[in-house]
Amino acid sequence: MDAAITPIALKHQLAAFPPPTLVDVRRQPAFDADREVIRGALRRLPETVDTWAAEIDPWRPVVVYCVRGHEVGQGACAALRSRGLAARYVAGGLEQWRAEGNATQPFAAPTRWVTRERPKIDRIACPWLIRRFIDPAAEFFYVPNAEVRAFAAGEGATAYDIPDVDYAHVGPDCSFDAFIRRHKLGHPALDELARIVRAADTSALHLAAQAPGLLAASLGLSAMFADDHAMLKWGMLVYDSLYAWCREAQTETHGWYPEKLRAGATA
């Protein structure tokens, strides 16, 4: 595959799911002179690619861009590819993206979020929702329950999934529902995922046939990972796959049909 991707092809990919991880890798002086970025882009230095490459979700494609799509973007792309990532660079860089009439937006510092340690369902689902629909660069912290409010106040973070905050359980709804409601994110696929999350998180497994499976997978991940951020990394894949099912695969079935298999093998 050619490592270059055109702006129009990137635009189509960003509208698909899962979208690529998009990274602005302009050198610092170039970025300081123009602090506009493509919507959804992370900001990383090309000189430190060895460090931040480990942050990239390995199951998602990654697209980098520099000013004009020359050595900076191509070099970062090659470094990511050498680590086994499906990386591409934007042909023509940010300049070509704009020349084709595509929008940029001012760079903003990552939002910060804090909740209780040892997440299971809501405290993984909410970060997934934030990263995919609100702030791709968001930072997450897990601390003991007694320390959540003090951490939020001292570190400029927003607390969630604890009582008496904006993003919390209300009646039968869980914190995932609160994020969807406050950010007006609802659409059919996400509403279906919210029903599954709510059922698994609130012991209402009868609400969604998929909820027992999500609960089992979540408890299994918790048993596998003592590090909450390691669990978050792989929990993101769980929710990517569930959301993909909600978007595209609800009517698909699977079973064992030996006669069809035998007929196909002899055709």
What is each residue range found by the language model?
Residues R43-L45:
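Short acidic-hydrophobic, aromatic-tinged amphipathic segments that line or gate anion-handling sites
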Residues G93-N102, T111:
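Long, charge-dense
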Residues M1-E36, Q105-C126, R132, G255-E259:
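Flexible, polar/low-complexity N-terminal or interdomain linker segments that lie immediately upstream
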Residues D32-I38, A150-G154:
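Short loop/helix-cap segments at secondary-structure boundaries that form the rim of catalytic
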Residues P20, V62, A87-R88, A138-F140:
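Hydrophobic anchor at the start of a short beta-strand
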Residues V49-Q96:
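Catalytic cysteine-centered active loop of the rhodanese-like fold, especially the PTP/DSP P-loop
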Residues P110-R118, D122-E259, A267:
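Extended, well-folded catalytic/binding cores that form a central cleft or groove in large enzyme
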